[in-house]
């Protein structure tokens, strides 16, 4: 979607006072939160397109972030449609976990509140803030006030990376819970299937996070964001060798937190 107007730029390259005020973090945050109350203004079709391409070609998703920067002078999303759809996915999959684990209504509701407000929002805010600090502090090519990683963009990168992880671990894995956790939890096939799904899910998270920050032209050495793959591979080999079952641990954790 093309904007109806573009920011006015002075000859010295700075925004006019009116446009600068409009592009402050507070103004962007207010506009984003306001649109949460107006579903008709959200582009859900485009959000679905992004969700599909996060699995098949995540680079295309970040090309759109480049386009938004050129047309709207911000890297972060200004449309909360993606967040709304992600929240729906999270709620539906959590209810599915409650059903598969034979939880009652109150237990499922408690699990849903934990997953939404702690696992998704709380952990998401923590990771986004950490990445925002690290990238601005250590990965800037030329630190200055004109170029910085927006906190909203760091949060968007987290949401992008979190979505495939959510689908794999909270949706697709539901179809294997009985075999991975109940029937074959201590068998090689059980923890091999479960741990492989964890490997793929976390691998997606690391890779999409790397793509998000490598898309910013003013950052350097973003390849360091791929280093967790080494630890991930080591943990996977150890888990298979020692018979650790991550999915069984997740189910135990979910049941324990609602008791």
Swiss-Prot record:
Q: Name one GO biological process term.
A: protein localization to cell surface
Recorded GO molecular functions are: RNA binding
Q: Identify the stretch(es) annotated as Disordered.
A: 1-22
Matches recorded under InterPro entries: UNC-50
Show the stretches that span the lipid bilayer: 81-101, 111-131, 163-183, 199-219, 223-243
Where can this protein be found? Nucleus inner membrane; Golgi apparatus membrane
**Polar residues compositional bias, start-end:** 1-15
- Superkingdom, natural source: Eukaryota
Topological domain ranges for the Lumenal compartment: 102-110, 184-198, 244-259
The entry's protein name is: Protein unc-50 homolog
Protein species of origin: Danio rerio (Zebrafish)
Q: Which gene encodes it?
A: unc50
């Amino acid at each position: 979607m093309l904007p109806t107007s573009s920011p006015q730029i002075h000859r010295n390259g700075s925004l006019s006072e009116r446009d600068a005020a409009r592009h402050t973090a507070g103004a962007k945050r207010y506009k984003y939160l306001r649109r949460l109350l107006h579903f008709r203004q959200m582009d859900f079709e485009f959000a679905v397109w992004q969700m599909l391409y996060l699995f098949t070609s995540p680079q295309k998703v970040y090309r759109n972030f480049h386009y938004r920067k050129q047309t709207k002078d911000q890297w972060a999303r200004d449309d909360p449609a993606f967040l709304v759809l992600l929240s729906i996915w999270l709620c539906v999959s959590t209810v599915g976990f409650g059903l598969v684990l034979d939880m009652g209504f109150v237990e499922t509701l408690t699990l849903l509140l934990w997953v939404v407000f702690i696992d998704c929002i709380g952990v998401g805010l923590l990771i986004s803030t950490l990445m925002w600090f690290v990238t601005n502090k250590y990965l800037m090519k030329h630190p200055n006030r004109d170029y910085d990683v927006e906190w909203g963009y760091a949060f968007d990168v987290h949401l992008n990376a979190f979505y495939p992880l959510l689908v794999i671990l909270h949706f697709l894995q539901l179809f294997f819970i009985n075999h991975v956790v109940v029937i074959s939890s201590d068998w090689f096939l059980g923890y091999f299937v479960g741990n492989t799904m964890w490997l793929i899910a976390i691998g997606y998270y690391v890779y999409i996070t790397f793509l998000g920050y490598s898309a910013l032209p003013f950052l350097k050495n973003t390849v360091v964001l791929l280093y967790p793959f080494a630890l991930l591979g080591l943990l996977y080999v150890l888990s298979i060798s020692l018979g650790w079952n991550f999915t069984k641990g997740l189910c135990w954790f979910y049941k324990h937190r609602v008791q």
